[in-house]
Amino acid sequence: MKTKIIVIVGPTAVGKTALAIEVAKRFNGEVVSGDSQQVYRGLDIGTAKASPEEQAAVPHHLIDVREITESYSAFDFVSEAKMTIEGIHNRGKLAIIAGGTGLYIQSLLEGYHLGGETPHEEILAYRASLEPYSDEELAHLVDQAGLEIPQFNRRRAMRALEIAHFGQDLENQETLYEPLIICLDDERSQLYERINHRVDLMFEAGLLDEAKWLFDHSPNVQAAKGIGYKELFPYFRGEQTLEEASESLKQATRRFAKRQLTWFRNRMQVTFYQIGESGVQDRILSQIEEFLDD
């Protein structure tokens, strides 16, 4: 029997953390961060981690598990998330995955029991190799492999190519989880206003000092490549004014949010909820209750 989990995704600044905490309180759950940057110790403001008070109210996992000089991959996330979810389930609680790193969450949900000779790491590496291809290029690869995909989309194409590449050993495996995937969204103008406002609040909370610490200690590590830090480095080098760097950060974050939505829309089977609609949280909680009772 597959383990039921709740997955909350969506663009940055849309309210994933707040909803995850509410769901955890309502359904006796624990939150697993699905964010590639929140794993790093010391990067708190720019990654929008749950506050210490929020983490004290509801257990959070996969936050502050790496130093800024260490690397972190989709394979690391899947391996650690699987162990974390198993522990939550064994405690009789509900695992709630919340985050915006689509590749990590998709890899977790499409992770397979591999009893044959194909390690999960190889599958993730192959999947990552397909990411740069456009839809047209993927369709060409599918045709070359002699595969047929009704109602073509990226997720189906990549899955079919994985099966063709690794063979029946992969095709016959079952996924580990039964997920309910909720994707939060907002009207574009409203979302962009939320992003701009959150960046302003981050500066008030000390983002500049946090980014300067990263710039002084490890400007070239993987942790420094995330949105929220590298956009401020030109200011530290004297190449931009603070106002210019702030606007650059807001623009980069808005573009990132757009890419996130495209990912979730095209590559994952999600239920969309507009956060600006009346009663949306009650509808989400009702859907979760029905899912868990089914």
Swiss-Prot record:
Q: Where is this site: Interaction with substrate tRNA?
A: T101, R127
Which cofactor is recorded for it?
A: Mg(2+)
Extract one GO BP annotation from the record: tRNA modification
- Does the keyword field hold Magnesium? yes
Q: Does the keyword Nucleotide-binding apply?
A: yes
What top-level branch of life does the organism fall under? Bacteria
Membrane-spanning ranges: none
* Ranges where the record places region Interaction with substrate tRNA: 35-38
Which parts of the sequence bind substrate?
A: T12, A13, V14, G15, K16, T17
Q: Write one Gene Ontology MF term.
A: tRNA dimethylallyltransferase activity
Give UniProt keywords alphabetically.
ATP-binding, Magnesium, Nucleotide-binding, Transferase, tRNA processing
Q: Where does ATP bind?
A: G10, P11, T12, A13, V14, G15, K16, T17
This entry's Enzyme Commission designation comes to 2.5.1.75
**Catalysed reaction, written as an equation:** adenosine(37) in tRNA + dimethylallyl diphosphate = N(6)-dimethylallyladenosine(37) in tRNA + diphosphate
Q: Which family does it belong to?
A: Belongs to the IPP transferase family.
Function per UniProt? Catalyzes the transfer of a dimethylallyl group onto the adenine at position 37 in tRNAs that read codons beginning with uridine, leading to the formation of N6-(dimethylallyl)adenosine (i(6)A).
- Subunit and interaction comment: Monomer.
What name goes with this protein? tRNA dimethylallyltransferase
